[in-house]
């Protein structure tokens, strides 16, 4: 499986044939393999990647990097893999591991929107807009009657909206710029400009 860590730069449009296609530009890598985990030793197979050099690290992390002979990195993320023996600590993974035209899954953290009402958070239609109505943007009934005399857990209500981990699947790689570590994918990816994104080979690619 191919994987890399990056940061979202922003969106633009490119021409593919006669079509204008919306794309997201991602600064992807270079990443360094910090640690590989195996079923025998750790209970599962995974590879730990580091991204962006760190100026300061605490002592436990400094010891972790020293153990594997890798420079301290700012971001550490794990990716599950089937065969961790393909990777070694210190190995560099660049954006050119991906190919133009292949499909990837991109994981990011959505924009945090703070405390939001039910209409914005869940898309509720709200109350009547006409004169005489006493609720316009409220969510309406939230329970039943004497029984069960409570609101069920999981009821869609006002609350904090956004800042959630979301994966968008099957985004096509439109272009790659290895010199500048840029990956261009078709469509949008979660998060604000400068947000961290995890890119891996599509789990169920389009045929």
From Swiss-Prot:
| Alphabetized InterPro entries for the sequence | Ribosomal_uL3, Ribosomal_uL3_bac/org-type, Ribosomal_uL3_CS, Transl_B-barrel_sf
Q: Which domain of life is it from?
A: Bacteria
Q: GO MF terms on file?
A: rRNA binding; structural constituent of ribosome
Gene3D superfamilies, A to Z: 3.30.160.810, Translation factors
| Keyword annotations of the record | Ribonucleoprotein, Ribosomal protein, RNA-binding, rRNA-binding
PROSITE patterns, from UniProt? RIBOSOMAL_L3
Matching SUPFAM superfamilies, A to Z?
Translation proteins
Give a GO biological-process term. Answer: translation
GO CC, alphabetical: cytosolic large ribosomal subunit
State whether keyword Ribosomal protein applies.
yes
PANTHER family in the record, alphabetically? 50S RIBOSOMAL PROTEIN L3, LARGE RIBOSOMAL SUBUNIT PROTEIN UL3C
Q: What does this protein do?
A: One of the primary rRNA binding proteins, it binds directly near the 3'-end of the 23S rRNA, where it nucleates assembly of the 50S subunit.
Instruction: Name the protein family.
Output: Belongs to the universal ribosomal protein uL3 family.
What is known about its subunit structure?
Part of the 50S ribosomal subunit. Forms a cluster with proteins L14 and L19.
Output this protein's name. Answer: Large ribosomal subunit protein uL3
Biological source species: Thermotoga maritima (strain ATCC 43589 / DSM 3109 / JCM 10099 / NBRC 100826 / MSB8)
- Upper classification of the organism: Bacteria, Thermotogati, Thermotogota, Thermotogae, Thermotogales
**Protein encoded by which gene:** rplC
